[in-house]
Amino acid sequence: MYVILSSKPGQFRTELVEGLVAVEAYDYLFYGRRTAHFVIAELAHPVKVKVVEEFGEDVDATSRPAPTVNYVPSKFLEQFDTLQGARDELTRLATFGSMDITLVKRDVHARDWRATD
């Protein structure tokens, strides 16, 4: 089974946990600006996906509260039987009329998916 994990820089990020293996990674560009990052991951068994709250650059680092961490059961994520099924869904998510939306494939092993453009 495959799932799509999403992260929105400055808002939240999902992190891999044991039982999830990253297969492909994509940046979502909206009119040339990266607004999200997606990872297609293979799900070996039911897990709880780690979701970490992030803070934007507008929040002063010294007054920033500790991030909230949640664990979301994988049963709540849409699951795909094949890698191609997950790719097709990601493509569908990145298509909306004539808007300038692009998926850019990234190195799945890159550590800092939050880097600015």
Residue positions per predicted region:
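A structural signal for short, well-ordered beta-strand elements
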Residues: E78-Q79
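Short aromatic-glycine-(Arg/Gly/Cys) micro-motifs in beta-strand/loop hairpins
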Residues: M1-S74, R92-T95, M99-R111
